[in-house]
Design a protein with these regions (language model features):
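N-terminal secretory signal peptides and thylakoid transit peptides that target proteins
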Residues: 1-18
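C-terminal segment of N-terminal export signals and the immediately downstream linker at the start
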Residues: 22-47, 54-56, 115, 154-155
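A charge-rich, low-complexity, intrinsically flexible signal that marks solvent-exposed coils, linkers
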Residues: 60, 87, 93, 105-114
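Short acidic-hydrophobic surface loop/beta-edge motif
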Residues: 64-68, 115-119
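Hydrophobic core segments of beta-strands in well-ordered, beta-rich domains
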Residues: 74-75, 124-127
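Compact alpha-helical subdomains of small soluble proteins
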Residues: 118-123, 130
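C-terminal partner/receptor-binding element of secreted or periplasmic proteins
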Residues: 136-155
Length: 155
């Protein structure tokens, strides 16, 4: 089992030159928003529907945006916005767009749109590419742990 100490050791072991280190997750001390947003934008303005077409992250536009669960979601096209609006649970990232790996450990961490996985038709985001590597070591197990932890994480 990965402990906080091992997580910190792994993060510090990554070479500093050009490497992306694992952001230290944190336990929620007070109620956190259900959806992670940076600057009021879900997925940092990235189109959530675009992850499902095989192209990976695509920047959304404020021209094609909507409000869902108190957060603004941007889309690359009106068609993607309409698809999301028709079935947001299909396209919205699991764990509210917070880092899925951190959720599996019982913590919250912000995410990067470039650290993502679509698994069994669901979108999972991670804090960075190193967290994604750790997440991919046991996706089904990490999902199970994250789902078990999730009700208590937001506070």
């Amino acid at each position: 089992m990965l402990t906080r100490r091992r997580l910190l050791t792994a993060a510090l072991a990554v070479p500093a030159a050009g490497a992306v280190t694992l952001a230290m997750p944190r336990r929620a001390m007070a109620a956190e928003p259900e959806i992670f947003s940076a600057g009021g934008l879900a997925i940092r303005g990235t189109d959530p529907v675009a992850y499902f077409d095989g192209n990976g992250p695509v920047a959304g536009s404020s021209e094609h945006s909507l409000m869902w669960k108190g957060t603004t979601w941007n889309f690359a096209s009106a068609a993607n916005r309409d698809a999301f609006e028709a079935d947001p649970e299909q396209y919205a990232p699991i764990f509210g767009g917070y880092c899925a790996y951190a959720a599996s450990l019982g913590y919250l961490a912000p995410t990067s749109p470039d650290a993502w996985t679509v698994y069994e038709g669901k979108l999972y985001l991670n804090a960075n590419l190193r967290a994604r590597e750790l997440w991919l070591e046991d996706v089904p197990g990490n999902i199970a742990k994250g789902l078990a932890n999730w009700p208590g994480i937001l506070g």
